[in-house]
Amino acid sequence: FELTIGTIDEVPVVVYPGRIHLYQGYSAAEVTSLVRHARHLGCRDIIFACATGAVTENAHVGLGILTDQINLTGRNPLIEWDGIRDVETPFVGMVDAYTPYLRTLARGVADDLGIAVDEGVYAGVLGPCFETPAEIGMMRALGVSYVGMSTVNEVIMAHALGMNVLGLTLATNESGDPDTSHESVLEVAGRYASDFERLVRGVLHLL
């Protein structure tokens, strides 16, 4: 990755242009390597962005703030990471997986800018296939609002490293929609790119 280091509104930032995924054959330790890199550079706060499918009626196509997560990938980076021996404990607490004050901050910024955002629980799955109707039904029963193929392992790693976490999502489709394709996901993402940028800039300005 060709990362970018600079400032946004005088806030020092490190920006990574993408991520690797478990479904590409990488391990959970490899998938979370950018989180460790950011912490090594001195980052205390980290903002994760992900594309998701909206699972419930309370989550619509558009921007959302993640409030909690369910790891359905069957992986955990703390099992595979050699550096776990240097962490105080491998039994990392995941209460407030997404830092409350950052969630509140993002909600306030969205309201001030007139950007519509939903909030909800995120389920991370292995992928790369989209979910079956039965799987979506299970997630609804579990209280899931959004589903995607990333992020949950990265959040675990961030907590192990003592970082504050904000999760922002763009729900690009309603999960279970038979017309969903990779191309349609990219098309919807493009429509919301400007609002997403404004939201992130607004949050950074207040950090």
Regions found by a protein language model. Give the residues of each.
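Metabolite-binding pocket within alpha/beta catalytic cores that recognizes anionic/polar moieties
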Residues: F1-M94
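General beta-strand structural signal in soluble alpha/beta enzymes
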Residues: V15-P17, I46-C50, I65, V117-A123, ...
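Non-catalytic positions within long, well-ordered alpha-helices that form the structural scaffold/packing
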Residues: A38-G42, R140, H159
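Polyanion-binding loop/helix "lid" in catalytic or ligand-binding cores
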Residues: V87-Y98, T104, I136, A189-V200
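Active-site/ligand-binding-proximal alpha/beta "capping" segment
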Residues: R103, G108-S145, V200, L207
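Zn-dependent metallopeptidase/amidohydrolase metal-coordination segment
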Residues: M149-V185
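His/Asp/Glu-rich mid-to-C-terminal helical/loop segments that flank catalytic regions of hydrolases
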Residues: S175-L207
